[in-house]
Amino acid sequence: MNTLVVDAHVRIGQHREAALSVEALLAAMDRTGVDRAVVAPSEAQIAYDNRAGNAATTQAARATGGRLVAYAVANPWRGAAALDELAWAHEQGARALAVDSALQGFDLLDGLVDPLVRFAAEHRWPVYVRTGTPPGHLPLPTAALARRFPEVAFVMGRSGATDFWIDAAPALRHAPNLYGDTSYAPWDTVLGEFARDPEIGTSRLVFSSDQPYATAVGEMRRMRDWLLPAHERAAVLGTTMAGLLGLEKEPPA
């Protein structure tokens, strides 16, 4: 049986320094053997125009028959309106929450995002938190947030890349419901450390290309070069993320 490959985080649309259309993403997935990808909207839509962003991701999911899976976004500064936005996105088919506290302008531990995480918990959504921007948008604060919500699966986006990789393993040890993503991380150092750590292991890692900031070919090549037992490779490449999302084990036709 072929290994199911799920890309845990991609951003579609026009960004400040890059862009990725749905068509270009699907072509990249075909070239690299990715079955499904979880898509977040553009930077501006994450920060401000949440409705346009949620419409973009959920429409992409419907148009591809579920090959693309939608993240929902809402700026927590909007208060009750942010929860209404997540409810709308849920009705449209979103299956996870994406948070970028640097873009959205809040501290992970100031309580502002907590109502959104509670919404995710109620709907059994995993929560992606992009990390790597100092001073507050980092692995250890993400782990502290995850500890507040042990019933929620958190994905530590970029695993602190690149200056804060040193904090990624301690963060994963601190919060057992936190998962690292593989984007940018060398397999022979960062990912190898995760895999060898008895408190982490490959079952706590999910593959992410983080397009359009990284390339699908480069990220997948590093995964293919990483020598892992077949069952561990399958978990990293797709089955763990599929489980967090509640997806079927086989990709859609």
Report the location of each language-model feature.
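Histidine-centered catalytic micro-motifs
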Residues: 5-13, 131
